């Protein structure tokens, strides 16, 4: 069976790729540039991940409309990226309105064309308090949308292997599968060295701290988050 992987270049999409690779599927990879601050580094990591797993069927898509519509510190340089708030429940400034729905729509379109039966995405429910499109209920609903909005003979399923995992468990799973964490990027702000203080860096650093393993990427600072 063919499967499409949505690969941002981040830690979660890396481990999702490692899991999919274990299933011996025919893999195709999609990356979306939506005008995010770190798009060059993310694209570099996407390509490195694909090279590592020998994924040759790739699609790199421009989705600049998400930057044009605005509303997120990831795409609007005038909006500051929020610092780490690991206990907060408010939606952070890094939320890109309805982003994952757009990504999934593009992935479904491509899957129909190439005959893929699965779409893998590295969504994590742990983040759902800040990101409403990272919840299992969202993906359950989108599977129904696919069923209603594609040809009758189309059978495409969204797969979320990390959805119920904690970040530290994702690190452990990646280590178990020998995922190349050095090929991934999570920072919202920087493309040289990861900042270490944005929400995404904090979640990643805390996950590695909890496992007792040092994150292999370079940081400007490495605060303690546990």
Curated annotation (Swiss-Prot):
<comment type="pathway">
    <text>Purine metabolism; 7-cyano-7-deazaguanine biosynthesis.</text>
</comment>
<comment type="similarity">
    <text>Belongs to the QueC family.</text>
</comment>
<keyword id="KW-0671">Queuosine biosynthesis</keyword>
<feature type="binding site">
    <location>
        <begin position="7"/>
        <end position="17"/>
    </location>
    <ligand>
        <name>ATP</name>
    </ligand>
</feature>
<dbReference type="InterPro" id="IPR014729">
    <property type="entry name" value="Rossmann-like_a/b/a_fold"/>
</dbReference>
<feature type="binding site">
    <location>
        <position position="187"/>
    </location>
    <ligand>
        <name>Zn(2+)</name>
    </ligand>
</feature>
<feature type="binding site">
    <location>
        <position position="198"/>
    </location>
    <ligand>
        <name>Zn(2+)</name>
    </ligand>
</feature>
<keyword id="KW-0547">Nucleotide-binding</keyword>
<comment type="function">
    <text>Catalyzes the ATP-dependent conversion of 7-carboxy-7-deazaguanine (CDG) to 7-cyano-7-deazaguanine (preQ(0)).</text>
</comment>
<keyword id="KW-0067">ATP-binding</keyword>
<feature type="binding site">
    <location>
        <position position="201"/>
    </location>
    <ligand>
        <name>Zn(2+)</name>
    </ligand>
</feature>
<dbReference type="GO" id="GO:0008616">
    <property type="term" value="P:queuosine biosynthetic process"/>
</dbReference>
<dbReference type="GO" id="GO:0005524">
    <property type="term" value="F:ATP binding"/>
</dbReference>
<keyword id="KW-0436">Ligase</keyword>
<keyword id="KW-0862">Zinc</keyword>
<dbReference type="GO" id="GO:0016879">
    <property type="term" value="F:ligase activity, forming carbon-nitrogen bonds"/>
</dbReference>
<protein>
    <recommendedName>
        <fullName>7-cyano-7-deazaguanine synthase</fullName>
        <ecNumber>6.3.4.20</ecNumber>
    </recommendedName>
</protein>
<dbReference type="Pfam" id="PF06508">
    <property type="entry name" value="QueC"/>
</dbReference>
<feature type="binding site">
    <location>
        <position position="195"/>
    </location>
    <ligand>
        <name>Zn(2+)</name>
    </ligand>
</feature>
<keyword id="KW-0479">Metal-binding</keyword>
<dbReference type="GO" id="GO:0008270">
    <property type="term" value="F:zinc ion binding"/>
</dbReference>
<dbReference type="InterPro" id="IPR018317">
    <property type="entry name" value="QueC"/>
</dbReference>
């Amino acid at each position: 069976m063919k499967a499409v992987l949505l690969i941002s270049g981040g830690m979660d999409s890396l481990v999702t790729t490692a899991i999919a690779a274990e299933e011996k599927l025919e893999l195709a990879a999609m990356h979306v540039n939506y005008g995010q601050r770190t798009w060059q580094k993310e694209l570099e990591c996407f390509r490195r991940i694909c090279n590592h797993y020998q994924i040759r069927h790739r699609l790199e898509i421009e989705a600049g409309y998400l930057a044009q519509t605005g509303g997120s510190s990831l795409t609007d340089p005038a909006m500051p990226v929020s610092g780490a708030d690991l206990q907060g429940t408010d939606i952070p400034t890094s939320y890109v309105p309805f982003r994952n729905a757009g990504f999934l729509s593009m992935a479904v379109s491509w899957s129909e064309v190439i005959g893929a039966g699965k779409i893998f995405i590295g969504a994590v429910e742990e983040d759902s308090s800040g990101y409403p499109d990272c919840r299992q209920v969202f993906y359950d609903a989108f599977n129904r949308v696919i069923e209603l909005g594609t040809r009758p003979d189309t059978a495409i399923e969204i797969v979320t292997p990390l959805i119920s995992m904690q970040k530290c468990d994702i690190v452990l799973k990646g280590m178990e599968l020998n995922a190349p964490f050095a090929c991934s990027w999570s920072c919202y702000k920087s493309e040289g060295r990861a900042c270490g203080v944005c929400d995404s860096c904090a979640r990643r650093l805390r996950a590695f701290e909890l496992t007792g393993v040092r994150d292999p990427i370079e940081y400007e600072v490495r605060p303690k988050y546990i």
